[in-house]
From Swiss-Prot:
Protein name per its UniProtKB record: Putative uncharacterized protein DDB_G0270496
Pfam assignment, any one: TRAUB
Region (Disordered): 1-36, 51-187, 200-224
Record field: compositional bias (Acidic residues): 117-130, 138-182
Family of this protein: Belongs to the AATF family.
Residue runs in coiled coils: none
Biased composition (Basic and acidic residues): 87-97, 200-210
Disulfide bonds: none
Length: 523
């Protein structure tokens, strides 16, 4: 449209100039000459405009048009922007945007709203002048339509517009960032659109990437953490129970031996026998409850094979051998599960320790790289030595029904001579293992409180480093040093008074309210 308007204005001005020269001639001759000149020069002007690149003004940027009057004017610049590649694949322009593009999506010269209004006013004025001189308006309109169609075909404006629409419809999400950066940006709206598309592309890529922790993995991790917490709580409860049982074990070791057990009961009254029976019954019931609890836990575990036979129970009226046989069958049932569990967790711990040690293989010198089950089996092979360690009498205590031979033997042995270890088959003493548990408990507590203790150590060091407040101006007697004494309370200084000349008789008469005077009179 802008090209057609320019053509129309150029043609009208040229025709009016020629027409004014012919007005001096006769009326009819001037009109015929004017039409001839108009018909001749119109084709020439169109050919000149089509073949001349200087007078052609291409289409303007529609986005740069100020339709609402709220955009700033584009300032012209003499800066050289270099060559701009076709098809919108040139490099991004820096600095001021040029006022005219010869190729690309927005080809043509930029114009403001004010320039368009001025062109329309000039066009109206030229049309009025042309009507005054008798121009044929219908012919001019037809010529303008033809010229506009030719110019549109010449510049392929419609084809480019269709290509742009097709490109917008076929826009893909996997387009490279380099193509986005190379597009010529003519306004802030284009830049905002490009940034928005980049943001959408990044969000889609993030959604396609696999997540490290999904919903299912998160639930599994939470379940593992809860199980670990429960295991730690159970271990602490078992350790507390073992600590409380230590006193019971020491008391059980003081009970009379089977040889003198019957004699001990016969010498005492029936109340002692009744208490012994109650203690035995309570112990059997405790063993039975622990056995039943273990059986229920085994049934809940799917990894342990189910038992087809009827469940056995421990009753207080059973003998000691029958109770031990029932417990041994339960242990054999759990043997396979114990071995698998120990192997699995030992492998996990070994992998973790090797990772923490930097892959140096810290387990290379432990029992010649044997498995954990083989190490346990090698330890249990010497079962007699292990059993003998539990029969060692490590502390001095008196067993009921035995003579006190320890004191006499201790007095006879010299101090330099080493005492021999005393073993007793009727006692159970695992003090060495008990001390190991206590050391582990103390180490764990110290690790937990390490943060707090480290804090107090740092605070103590800071207090040591802290300088005392010293007034440097107090030297050389510049500040008086004095101490305030506390006030005296309920105290008066003595006053010296002259001794009065008292009469002794009068003094005695005044004693006890005048009673001294009565006694004197009686005498």
């Amino acid at each position: 449209m802008a090209v057609s308007k320019n053509i129309k204005s150029n043609v009208s001005t040229h025709v009016t100039k020629k027409a004014t020269k012919k007005t001096t001639n006769n009326g009819e001759e001037s009109k015929t000459v004017k039409k001839a000149v108009n018909n001749k020069l119109l084709s020439d002007e169109i050919n000149e405009i089509l073949h001349s690149s200087e007078n052609i003004k291409k289409s303007i940027d529609p986005e740069s048009m100020d339709y609402f009057g709220d955009s700033a004017k584009v300032s012209k610049s003499d800066e050289n922007f270099g060559e701009i590649e076709d098809d919108n694949r040139g490099t991004r322009l820096k600095g001021d945007i040029p006022t005219e593009f010869t190729s690309g999506k927005y080809s043509g010269k930029k114009s403001s709203r004010k320039d368009n209004d001025m062109e329309e006013d000039d066009e109206l004025d030229q049309d009025n002048e042309y009507d005054i001189f008798g121009g044929d308006k219908q012919d001019d309109d037809d010529g303008d339509d033809d010229n506009s169609e030719d110019l549109d075909d010449a510049f392929d404006f419609q084809d480019k517009q269709d290509d742009d629409d097709d490109d917008d419809d076929k826009e893909d999400d996997d387009e490279d960032d380099d193509d986005d950066e190379n597009v010529v940006v003519s306004s802030n709206i284009d830049r905002a659109d490009m940034l928005f598309k980049k943001l959408q592309k990044q969000e889609k890529e993030e959604e396609k990437q696999p997540k490290l922790v999904g919903h299912t993995n998160e639930a599994d991790e939470m379940e593992k953490a809860q199980n670990t917490k429960n295991q730690t709580a159970l271990y602490n409860e078992f350790l507390t129970t073992r600590i409380l049982l230590q006193k019971t074990i020491n008391c059980a070791n003081k009970l009379p031996k089977p040889k003198i057990y019957k004699e001990f009961l016969e010498l005492n009254d029936e109340s002692l026998q009744k208490k012994f029976k109650e203690t035995k019954t309570a112990s059997c019931l405790l063993i039975s409850e622990l056995y039943n609890l273990q059986s229920e836990l085994i049934d809940l575990n799917d990894e342990i094979p189910k038992q087809q036979q009827s469940k056995k129970r421990i009753r207080p009226d059973q003998s000691l051998s029958e109770i031990w046989n029932t417990i041994e069958e339960q242990n054999q049932r759990l043997d396979q599960f114990h071995n698998q569990t120990i192997t699995k967790w030992n492998n996990r711990i070994s992998v973790t320790s090797s990772i923490n040690s930097g892959g140096k293989g810290g387990n290379n010198l432990k029992s010649l790289n044997q498995s954990i089950l083989s190490q346990i089996q090698n330890t249990l092979n010497d079962f007699e030595r292990l059993q003998k360690r539990t029969k060692l009498k490590r502390t001095t205590y008196r067993i009921i029904g035995e003579k006190q031979q320890q004191l006499s033997s201790a007095n006879s042995i010299d101090q330099n001579e080493e005492e021999k270890d005393e073993y007793d088959d009727e006692i159970f003493d695992d003090t060495d293992f008990y001390q190991t548990l206590l050391k582990d408990l103390e180490a764990n507590n110290s690790e937990e409180n390490e943060v707090g203790s480290q804090y107090w150590i740092e605070m103590r060091n800071l207090k040591k480093k802290k300088k005392k407040k010293v007034n440097q101006k107090a030297s050389k007697g510049r500040i008086l040093r004095y101490e305030v004494f506390p006030k005296l309370e309920n105290f008066m200084t003595p006053q010296s008074l002259p001794i009065p000349d008292w009469n002794i008789d009068q003094l005695y008469q005044n004693l006890f309210g005048g009673l001294g005077n009565v006694n004197i009179n009686l005498n």
